Regions:
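Anion (oxyanion) recognition and catalysis
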Residues: 18, 144, 181
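A nucleotide-sugar donor-handling region in carbohydrate enzymes
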Residues: 36-105, 136-137
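Donor-nucleotide binding loops and adjacent catalytic segments primarily
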Residues: 80-82, 88-166
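Acidic donor-binding loop of glycosyltransferase active sites
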Residues: 164-175
Length: 184
């Protein structure tokens, strides 16, 4: 299997590689271009296979909807703990993660806006960014100006644990949405 997950790739690229692999799987959530694949996965809530009818070959199996969300096992492992934590309803720890890159520097904007709202003095904020994020320095500078303890973590490998130990998570609308849903 060749698994393709890239917005700039379409059937032209798939056809070029078809001779070198037995099967091609595409992960997509746009339903806006043709694919030459044997299996297509779209985890978008409410999406159905009819949305891809004119974009994939007849033989392609299309898996659509939240029931096909790809989650690492660690999220299932942290689920019970995370749901139990939610019972107290207090806001002591805020997690912010706008994906691995956050190319538009939304994280800094969120931190700035948070500084104008009322949060408990004991509240702490954890910001998670990817190693390729171009705005890490600006986010770190903004974090230092926050009225609450604010930590910036880069390139973490324990995202499920960080989410499970937060009371509220602010994040992008990608695959991490399903991770946040899993952990409550």
């Amino acid at each position: 299997w060749l698994i393709v997950d890239h917005y700039a790739i379409d059937e032209r690229w798939h056809k070029e590689l078809r001779p070198y692999c037995q099967k091609i799987m595409v992960i997509d959530d746009l339903a806006d271009r043709k694919h030459d694949c044997d299996l297509l996965l779209d985890q978008t809530f409410g999406r159905n296979s009819d949305d891809y009818q004119s974009f994939v070959p007849e033989y392609c199996q299309v898996l659509c909807g939240a029931e096909y969300a790809l989650l690492r096992p660690e999220f299932a492992e942290w689920r019970a703990y995370s749901l139990k934590r939610r019972e107290n309803g207090q806001l002591n720890h805020l997690l912010i993660n706008l994906g691995g890159v956050d190319k538009d520097n939304i994280t800094t904007q969120i931190l700035r806006e948070l500084s104008y709202i009322s949060l408990p003095n004991s509240c702490r904020i954890t910001v998670v960014m990817g190693v390729t994020a171009p705005w890490v320095k600006q986010v770190e500078e903004q974090a230092e100006q926050m009225p609450w303890l604010t930590e910036v973590k880069v390139g973490v490998n324990n995202m499920a644990e960080l989410m499970a130990n937060s009371d509220l998570a602010v994040g992008a609308a990608g695959a991490t949405s399903w991770e946040r849903c899993c952990l409550g």
